[in-house]
Amino acid sequence: MHAWLCTTPTGVDQLQWTQLPTPTPGPGQVLLEVKAASLNFPDLLIVQNKYQMKPELPFVPGSEYAGVVQAVGEGVSHLAVGQRVACLSGTGGFGTHTPVSYTHLRAHETSLH
């Protein structure tokens, strides 16, 4: 997988497009293939260390995104591989894949593209 990685929270010009191992979802998580992500003002603040949420470095920014479930972790029974979901998690959206807690996901209709 690839992701915009923040290793130094000094702004977007320091983000690096980085190849990373594809993660495995843990208990209560799904692995999401990101299909679309938005760029919001909090995303800009987070990568400058100016937001109230300060993720541990390094991290993949991107707070709002949508994608397709690729794998489900233990304890996740209401989401299935191939299902389309929207996510609001705070981080992870600026990568091709991300593990995310099922509590941050909402399924959306297949007619939405």
Where are these regions (language model features)?
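Extreme N-terminal starter segment of soluble prokaryotic enzymes
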Residues: 1-2
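Short beta-strand-to-turn element immediately C-terminal to the catalytic PLP-Schiff-base lysine
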Residues: 6, 47, 70-71, 99-101
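Short gly/ser/thr-rich secondary-structure transition/capping motifs
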Residues: 12-17, 50-51
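Glycine-rich beta-strand-centered segment in the early N-terminal region that forms part
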Residues: 21-38, 50-92
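Cytochrome P450 core scaffold surrounding the K-helix E-X-X-R motif
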Residues: 42-44
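A structural motif shared across PLP-dependent enzymes of the aminotransferase-like
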Residues: 89-101
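Conserved small/polar residues in nucleotide/adenosyl-binding loops
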Residues: 103-110
